[in-house]
Structure formats: C-alpha cells, structure tokens
Amino acid sequence: MATYAAFKHVELYNVGKAKKRVLRAPGGVSSDIFGSEQPQTPRNVKNLMASNIFSADTDAAQKNNVRQGAHRFYYIGETPRRGQKPVDSYSRLFGEPARPITPSKNHMKSNIPFGQNPNTAPLISKGNYNGKSGSVSSASSSVSSSTENLKINGGVRSEGNPVTGEGYKAGGTDYIQPAHLNGGSQVINKNRVPPGGYSSGLW
C-alpha cells in the first residue's frame, strides 16, 4: 500500500486556489435563462439570390485594394477578372448590341439516310459526297467508306433499314451464308443474348 506522502501533493497543494477556468452560459455572457425580453437587433443576412445586373459591384469597396500572393501584387479594379466582360454604363442600361439571329442546328437529328426520302439523302455533286472526294477513303472506316462508295457510284440501296431489318427481302443474298460442316444442318442457339443486351434497342 502506498504511503500518504506519495499522494499528498494531489489535494494539499491545490487547497485555497480557485480554478482559473470560468464556465460560461451556452447562450453567451448575456444569456438570460429566466425569460426577460432582450432588445432585438435585426441580423444582416446577405441575399445570395439577389440580382446585381444593373448595380455596380458593391463588394469592391469592402475588399482590400491590394491582394498579395506568391510574391505578386494585384490591384483590384485595375484589370477585369478573367472570363468577365468589362461593364460600362451603356451596356448596363441598354444591353449588348443586337446580334443577327442565326438558326440553331438540330444536334439530335440523325445524318444517316434511311429509305428513299430525298430530304434526308445527301446531295451528290461532281464526284463529291458530303465534302469528301470519291478517291479519298483512307481516313474513314470501312462501313462509312463502303456506303460512300455506293452513294458516289449511284448505287443507292433502298432495300431496307439495316438497324431494324425492316424492308429487307426474305431470301436476300446480301450476306454470305457459312458452309455447313460435316453435312449436318446448322443448329441455331436461340438462347444467345446480343451484344449490349436486349435493352440496346437494336433487337
């Protein structure tokens, strides 16, 4: 068992000394827990959704004139920030000058021609198709170059839609049928899932 002398410093040296930490009320020094009314001061809340199109920059007067960083000094207001247009009084009052209205391009419209619709088929003029000459096909893929060559040579195919399969002849010879091995009939596996699954919209 430890002696009294080993633990006497715990309480004997702290006797008579007040604690230096002062507890404060959760509401601060002026909180009143008994419910008396206190003077209400309105809070200054900045409206972040307010528009400042027609007003001058009010934050510029409150910010410092010199901004320091990485051994450089920038004077705010000397040059406009990147990405912002300089604002003068004429453009603030009357807006920007009127620009000619140009028709927008329909980016969702497909450029792939289907069937014999003359509106969707590209124009063929002087051996050029869509800005490409008939002899240049090295940069395009094999599928697009073969369709371009068909269009250039005047062999526009109108048998059907290659995506959905509508309009093709039942006994067409567009594809090469594989030879049957060992003289047996070919077994078609109906349980196969197409690439991309059935939700791809192609099947």
Curated annotation (Swiss-Prot):
Stretches for region Disordered: 123-163, 182-203
Entry keyword set: Cytoplasm, Cytoskeleton, Microtubule, Nucleus, Phosphoprotein
Modified residues (Phosphothreonine): T41, T102
Residues found modified as Phosphoserine: S30, S135, S146
Polar residues bias spans: 123-132
Superkingdom assignment: Eukaryota
GO biological process, one term: positive regulation of microtubule polymerization
GO molecular function, one term: microtubule binding
GO cellular component terms given for this protein: cytosol; microtubule; microtubule associated complex; nucleus; spindle
Segments of skewed composition (Low complexity): 133-146
Localization terms from the record: Nucleus; Cytoplasm; Cytoplasm, Cytoskeleton; Cytoplasm, Cytoskeleton, Spindle
Family from the record: Belongs to the MAP Jupiter family.
Function: Binds to all microtubule populations.
The protein's name in its UniProt record: Microtubule-associated protein Jupiter
Lineage, uppermost ranks: Eukaryota, Metazoa, Ecdysozoa, Arthropoda, Hexapoda
Gene, per the UniProt record: Jupiter
